[in-house]
Amino acid sequence: MDLSLTNRQQQVLRATVDHYIATAEPVGSKALAREYALSISPATIRNVMGRLEEEGLLFQPHTSAGRVPSDFGYRHYVDELVMPSTTLMSQIKQALDQKLRTDSWIFEVLLRDAAQILATLSGCVALITLPQAATSTIRHLHLVQVEPHRVMLILVTDAYETQSVMMELPHSAWDEVDPDRIEQELQILSNFLNHHFVGSSLQDLVALDPCELDREFQKYTDFLKILLTDLTQQCKSLSPKNILVGGLAEVLRQPEFSELQQAQTLIHLLEDGQDLLRPLFNELMADEIKQGADVVPRSTKVNVRIGSENSLESIQAYSLVSSTYQKGELPMGSVGVLGPTRMAYEKVIALVTVTADYLSTCLTQVA
């Protein structure tokens, strides 16, 4: 629905939304005239608020109360009146630089830390999806003997996730082999796997047919069959990946969750609703890629869904601000903030934007 507002109407709408975000209380014309430099009388403000209510941007929760924004009012506010400043973006970037350790090669640790920081700074729930194991590519493979007849495959993906698979050595093939020789053989096999599968997906490795190996590696056929069987089971157990959640305690302090039922609904969704949230983030990622491909600069690709705009019924009382972090041009996962529709959109949009860009930079720099 296209809507053209006058400058005065936009000023009153912005003041109303800003007041409600800050106080969680309906506001009347006298309060707006007193607290905001609108340069118009309370009577004029009251008339403008009445017009905004007719357009569906504001409503009165009670007949004797002031007005609050509707979902449509928030939508116009976000689309037309919110633009995070470069100063705010720089402050958030500086905060992430100070608080996050990017020297850790375990990317999941970085994501967990980012979720907690995002939740603390936003006062809402932070949601960050881990990269899908099935679409990750292999960065490094290493076979190491951990005890007699037991070998561990250590696998690092391009997202710096680490997986390990423990397996038993085939006794018939290795019983009489010197331990030093076993170590040499494992190194040879590690080199072979790295040469053929670095840059490939886990599925490519799982699909390897040991019977098609070069003659010099035929003696490893039984060993590789066992290894690939165990790795296949490991991959199945990893899909789908979890969603990291931070800040439940933060958002429950908001007045919207003073009622027990509201709080319980949100807690249940975040603790037990992973199967609902993952498809939602996949949908949001697809929308962002479709809308932003080759047109919008990377840092502006933020998806804001407000209240009833959310396809998932259980979050239609909330707003979700999300963006995609990626490695180069390849989307890897999503960063989101979930909170009341009365959230500080300007700050949250800046937080999500900077965090997604930050994670993308970290992934790209370690490529």
Swiss-Prot record:
What role is this protein assigned? Answer: Negative regulator of class I heat shock genes (grpE-dnaK-dnaJ and groELS operons). Prevents heat-shock induction of these operons.
What gene name does this entry carry? hrcA
Native organism is Acaryochloris marina (strain MBIC 11017)
Entry keyword set: Repressor, Stress response, Transcription, Transcription regulation
Q: What is the protein name for this chain?
A: Heat-inducible transcription repressor HrcA
The cross-references to Gene3D superfamilies, in alphabetical order and at most eight, read: 3.30.450.40, Winged helix-like DNA-binding domain superfamily/Winged helix DNA-binding domain
Q: Which family does it belong to?
A: Belongs to the HrcA family.
Its GO biological process annotations read:
negative regulation of DNA-templated transcription
PANTHER family reported in the protein's UniProt record: HEAT-INDUCIBLE TRANSCRIPTION REPRESSOR HRCA
Task: State one Pfam family annotation.
Answer: HrcA
Molecular function via GO: DNA binding
The keyword Transport belongs to this UniProt entry's keyword annotation = no
